[in-house]
Amino acid sequence: TLLAELVGDLLPPGVLNIVQGFGREAGEALATSKRIAKIAFTGSTPVGSHIMRCAAENIIPSTVELGGKSPNIYFEDIMQAEPAFIEKAAEGLVLGFFNQGEVCTCPSRALVQESIYEPFMAEVMKKVKQIKRGNPLDTDTMVGAQASQQQFDKILSYLEIGQQEGAQVL
């Protein structure tokens, strides 16, 4: 991969290992290999549980960061801050969703105190409207397509669940 080409010669052999493939083939092979000294995994709880079982069977130390993404919470005192701070708070919320959920610390939702909902979300939506969607090969594109139809369908199902539970999709 490009990353390996860029930094491969800067690191001692074995420090950077890029393994491509799906979890069942690539991940499970790593989690059961006697050549692996330690496993660090970030991802879903079911997959993390499976990796920990595989690692335990082979007595491989492991560290996991699993699911349970937390909300970003905004209280009314934020609106008493300088405009630049409010803008950065709105930008932070947008950037949290910008990575498409691929970071364990990204928020899964925002909780905004009702008294500031309208003005704060107006600021957030200004930021959202600046996002250029399109072909991921276009250097001006900020958000491209989902990795697969399966991932796209999963996202739509979460939106549907949220709406059924009373969430508003903006």
Predicted segments with their positions:
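PLP-dependent aminotransferase-like
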Residues: 1-27, 84
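ALDH superfamily catalytic-core signature
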Residues: 11, 44-170
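Short beta-strand(s) of the beta-wing in winged-helix/HTH DNA-binding folds
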Residues: 17, 37, 168-170
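Beta-loop-alpha module in the N-terminal Rossmann-like domain of NAD(P)-dependent dehydrogenases
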Residues: 22-29, 43-50
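Well-formed, non-transmembrane alpha-helical positions, independent of function
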Residues: 29-30, 161
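Acidic-histidine catalytic/liganding microenvironments
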Residues: 33
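Periplasmic-binding protein-like
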Residues: 38-42
